[in-house]
Design a protein with these regions (language model features):
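Extended active-site and interfacial segments that coordinate phosphate-rich ligands
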Residues: 30, 166, 210-234, 288-290, ...
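A long amphipathic alpha-helix within ATP-dependent nucleotide-binding catalytic cores
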Residues: 222-277, 316-324
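Conserved N-proximal alpha/beta basic substrate-recognition cap immediately N-terminal to
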Residues: 28-140
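ATP-grasp fold ATP-binding core
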Residues: 109, 129, 139-160, 175-192, ...
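Phosphate-binding site of ATP-dependent enzymes
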Residues: 143, 166-225, 273-281
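C-terminal active-site "lid" helix and adjoining low-complexity regulatory extension at the edge
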Residues: 241-246, 279, 287-324
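N-terminal-proximal low-complexity accessory segments that begin disordered
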Residues: 1-40
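Glycine-rich phosphate-binding loop of ATP-grasp-fold ATP-dependent ligases
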Residues: 125-128, 144-170, 196-197, 220-238
């Protein structure tokens, strides 16, 4: 079965908007236009990588693998000529949208910490707030916190705040509205040592495949900068400087078991953090492709180095730089 790959980096913003007519900001449109070819790094012979413009005439058995699913992408594919039988239903799209809401990560972090205490080495707390009063209460408990919108990624829709500087206007500006009420995640601020993630693939029938460990780095605003593309053993050895590997194995086993219960087919990336306070085993749950998964696929090809996606001289570029 051949695949159609689509790099649509605006996916999280399209989920936040929720409408089929969504148009992303100009900078994100530029990223998609200039990096549409990215799936060529892992596509097999006979697969198609869509540039977002060409008309499509796909065989009925084609498997469509976008960066992420949204009603906006489905509309684009229909306009390109893709038959309805190859697209997810409206119900499935809404299910993916709700899974992608940060409330999923909030609930799973609490569940994991209750079931897998790891001798007190875990850290991280987050609260889903449905009113401005709940936001103020949560920030007051944490003292220093991150405000996060329900659907956002790579530093967008995220703001650091201290209890003493929290104002009504700031809460209103940071919040999104769902059915007329405030929706905002308040996350206790952690002093980061390193970002990492576990990458999985779910088959939609209870099967969970572990695809690898992702070591990635971001700027001070949380925007993605790049990944370390290396053998799994090297990545584990680096993390072992900071945390016992037995802890990582327990965390991985917990996620493998927990993910079996979700009605979902496709990639899942669990963003985590090594912090001065301990290990946070769930910062975000990405129900889509991630650069971490791409790095794992490149490592399987033996293309080791530093994978970077950057905006330079007014254009986007992606490459794997050899280790110096």
């Amino acid at each position: 079965m051949n695949c159609l790959y689509v790099f649509n980096p605006e996916n999280d913003m399209a989920l936040a908007d929720g409408k089929a007519s969504y148009t992303p900001p100009a900078r994100i449109r530029q990223m998609r236009q200039e990096l549409w070819w990215l799936p060529e790094w892992w596509a097999d012979e006979g697969d198609i990588v869509w540039n977002g413009e060409d008309k499509l005439n796909l065989p009925d058995e084609t498997r469509i693998l976008p960066w992420g699913w949204s009603t906006a992408l489905c509309r684009q594919l229909r306009q390109a000529g893709v038959q309805e039988s190859l697209l997810p239903s409206a119900e499935k799209l809404e299910h993916i949208r709700q899974l992608s809401h940060r409330q999923t990560a909030v609930a799973l972090l609490q569940e994991l910490r209750e079931q897998l205490p790891l001798d007190g080495h875990f850290c991280g707390e987050s609260t889903l707030c449905r009113s401005e009063e709940e936001v103020r209460d949560a920030v007051g408990r944490y003292g220093e916190a991150m405000l996060k919108q329900p659907w956002s990624s790579s530093g967008r829709g995220i703001r650091k705040i201290q209890a003493k500087t929290l104002s009504n206007s700031l809460v209103k500006g940071a919040s999104s509205k769902e059915q007329g009420e405030v929706s905002l995640i308040v996350e206790k601020f952690l002093h980061k040592v390193s970002d990492f993630a576990l990458e999985f693939w779910l088959d939609g029938k209870g099967g969970v495949e572990y695809r690898g460990l992702s070591l990635f780095y971001t700027n001070e605003r949380g925007a993605y900068l790049g990944n370390w593309v290396a053998p799994e053993g090297q990545k584990l050895a680096w993390l072992a400087q900071y945390v016992p590997l037995s802890y990582l194995q327990e965390i991985r086993r917990w996620w493998e078991q927990r993910l079996r219960s979700f009605d979902y087919e496709g990639p899942v990336g669990i963003d985590m953090m090594l912090a001065e306070e301990g290990i946070c085993p769930c910062i975000e749950v990405n129900w889509r492709w991630t650069m971490g998964l791409v790095a794992c696929l490149l490592a399987e090809q033996g293309r080791y180095g530093r994978m970077v996606v950057e905006y330079i001289y007014g254009h986007y570029a992606a490459e794997v730089e050899a280790f110096g």
